[in-house]
């Protein structure tokens, strides 16, 4: 619980939505994953078929997660998509390009910071296959 919020205030905010959970899943959160607009033009100049963020994720971030899996238990990689657009462009990007899924079947403890965001996740045991597929289709 956040130190600046006492338990009574927390109960008022969440009321009946405050739940005790019977099971939790080990995971790692991908935080503030976004492209630097100052480098988009440089990346676009290379003429590659994939965008910068997708390439960074599959080429650099996923191998780091795989290294981490050698020493800690982790079942999911997850993020909170800050997408308030009517057509959910960011959510579609995370789904189509990075292979995250909306996790509506799980009850999620959402931090206050991410309260308006969409929780998305994917199983770490599927990352290698998805990464391989990304590189097989890189120049398609």
Language-model features: locations:
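Short alpha-helical segment within the catalytic ATP-binding CA
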Residues: 55
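Non-catalytic substrate-recognition and accessory regions of acyl/acetyltransferase enzymes
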Residues: 1-48, 59, 63-140
């Amino acid at each position: 619980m956040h130190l600046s919020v006492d338990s009574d205030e927390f109960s008022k905010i969440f009321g009946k939505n405050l739940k005790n959970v019977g099971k939790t899943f080990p995971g790692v959160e991908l935080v503030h994953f976004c492209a630097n607009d100052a480098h988009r033009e440089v990346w676009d100049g290379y003429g590659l078929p994939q965008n910068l963020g997708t390439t960074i994720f599959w080429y650099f971030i996923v191998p780091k997660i795989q290294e981490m899996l050698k020493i800690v238990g982790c079942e999911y990689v997850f993020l909170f998509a800050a997408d308030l657009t009517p057509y959910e462009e960011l959510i579609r990007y995370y789904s189509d390009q990075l292979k995250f899924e909306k996790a509506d079947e799980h009850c999620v403890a959402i931090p206050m910071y991410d309260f308006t965001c969409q929780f998305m996740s994917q199983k770490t045991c599927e990352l290698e296959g998805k990464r391989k597929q990304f590189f097989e289709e890189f120049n398609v």
